[in-house]
């Protein structure tokens, strides 16, 4: 099937079939990353602009590597080195970038909805690399790919997501994607970090106790506390947070024996999870990073008009 969207703003906008297409393509493209020469001519002659208004290590680097492995030209623009520091608006930045005729803009922005605003004003494709606390679709896709590689399916899995749900765009993309693919999502976190009505996003159960969420889970996804998005301190101390919502070996034993431990990064060791869990045999955190390149290759491929041959 052909991917019918010009942009990828969020997993909320995609059907189950479209998510499946992006994941299947990522699995096929992943083989390129293990070749001696890690490059194919798929996007030769295309230009990808990485426009990042927020700090990023994994996502920006991963998108740049993904574009280059598809033979696209890449341009990296960060807020600190652009005219944004001189007061230029997003609209003016977009118009100036568009005048250079890029084919795809990959953007991260602190304001939720910024990508909808941009996509309506440019003719090229727009990929959301994270907008405020709204969505982070590439992270949601790579999380699902990592789970599917481990279990061979997403349907019926119990996925526990623990931490700062209110301020996490990763949590929202994971919820949209996982529930659409038939997984059962259980959330746990401090009451001050659990948004009201979150259950309406899909097949979601909110647990007051982390242990309830983790019990018999196939996947335990730990989230970072988003201090930079909090207007005020929502926790007495980090030590208290770790006591009630940190993942250690004792809590992990409540999950299934083959349960996966995941984290979108960056990790705060000793807060969200202990080092022995982060570095243990059940940790798939580095596998998530590895899968990120293939997933972002898939996203770039499909918004540029790529289509897999049908049987």
Swiss-Prot record:
Record pathway: Pyrimidine metabolism; UMP biosynthesis via de novo pathway; (S)-dihydroorotate from bicarbonate: step 2/3
GO BP terms, alphabetized: 'de novo' pyrimidine nucleobase biosynthetic process; 'de novo' UMP biosynthetic process; amino acid metabolic process
Catalytic activity: carbamoyl phosphate + L-aspartate = N-carbamoyl-L-aspartate + phosphate + H(+)
Pfam families: OTCace (PF00185), OTCace_N (PF02729)
Any one Gene Ontology molecular-function term assigned to this protein's record: amino acid binding
SUPFAM superfamilies (alphabetical): Aspartate/ornithine carbamoyltransferase
Residues that, per the record, bind L-aspartate: 86, 169, 224
Binding annotation for carbamoyl phosphate: 58-59, 108, 136, 139, 265-266
Keywords: Pyrimidine biosynthesis, Transferase
InterPro entries linked: Asp/Orn_carbamoyltranf_P-bd, Asp/Orn_carbamoylTrfase, Asp/Orn_carbamoylTrfase_sf, Asp_carbamoyltransf, Asp_carbamoyltransf_Asp/Orn-bd
Any Gene Ontology CC annotation: cytosol
EC number of this enzyme: 2.1.3.2
Annotated function: Catalyzes the condensation of carbamoyl phosphate and aspartate to form carbamoyl aspartate and inorganic phosphate, the committed step in the de novo pyrimidine nucleotide biosynthesis pathway.
UniProt-listed PANTHER family: ASPARTATE CARBAMOYLTRANSFERASE, ORNITHINE CARBAMOYLTRANSFERASE, MITOCHONDRIAL
Quaternary organization: Heterododecamer (2C3:3R2) of six catalytic PyrB chains organized as two trimers (C3), and six regulatory PyrI chains organized as three dimers (R2).
Family: Belongs to the aspartate/ornithine carbamoyltransferase superfamily. ATCase family.
Protein's recorded name: Aspartate carbamoyltransferase catalytic subunit
Organism per entry: Geotalea daltonii (strain DSM 22248 / JCM 15807 / FRC-32)
């Amino acid at each position: 099937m052909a991917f019918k969207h010009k942009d990828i703003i969020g997993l909320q906008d995609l059907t189950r079939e479209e998510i499946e297409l992006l994941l299947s393509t990522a699995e096929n493209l992943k083989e390129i990353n293990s070749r001696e020469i890690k490059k194919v001519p798929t996007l030769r002659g295309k230009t990808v602009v990485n426009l990042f208004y927020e700090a990023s290590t994994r996502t920006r680097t991963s998108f740049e590597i993904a574009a280059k492995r598809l033979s696209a030209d890449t341009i990296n623009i960060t807020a600190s080195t652009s005219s944004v520091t001189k007061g230029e608006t997003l609209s003016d930045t977009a118009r100036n970038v568009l005048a250079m005729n890029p084919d795809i803009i990959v953007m991260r922005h602190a304001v939720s909805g910024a990508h909808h605003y941009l996509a309506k004003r440019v003719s090229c494709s727009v990929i959301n690399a994270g907008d405020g606390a709204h969505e982070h679709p590439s992270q949601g896709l790579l999380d699902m790919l990592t789970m599917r590689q481990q279990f061979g399916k997403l349907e019926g899995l119990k996925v526990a997501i623990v931490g700062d749900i209110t301020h996490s765009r990763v949590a929202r993309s994971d919820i949209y994607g996982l529930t659409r693919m038939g997984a059962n999502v259980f959330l746990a976190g401090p009451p001050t970090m659990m948004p009201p009505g979150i259950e309406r996003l899909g097949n979601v159960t909110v647990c007051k106790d982390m242990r309830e969420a983790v019990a018999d889970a196939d996947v335990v996804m730990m989230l970072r506390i988003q201090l930079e998005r909090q207007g005020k301190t929502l926790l007495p101390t980090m030590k208290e947070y770790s006591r009630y919502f940190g993942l250690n070996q004792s809590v992990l034993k409540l999950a299934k024996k083959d349960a996966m431990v995941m984290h979108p990064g960056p990790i705060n060791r000793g807060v969200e999870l202990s080092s022995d869990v982060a570095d243990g045999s059940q940790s798939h955190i580095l596998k998530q990073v590895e899968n990120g390149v293939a997933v972002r290759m898939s996203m770039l491929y499909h918004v540029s008009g790529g289509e897999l041959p049908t049987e």
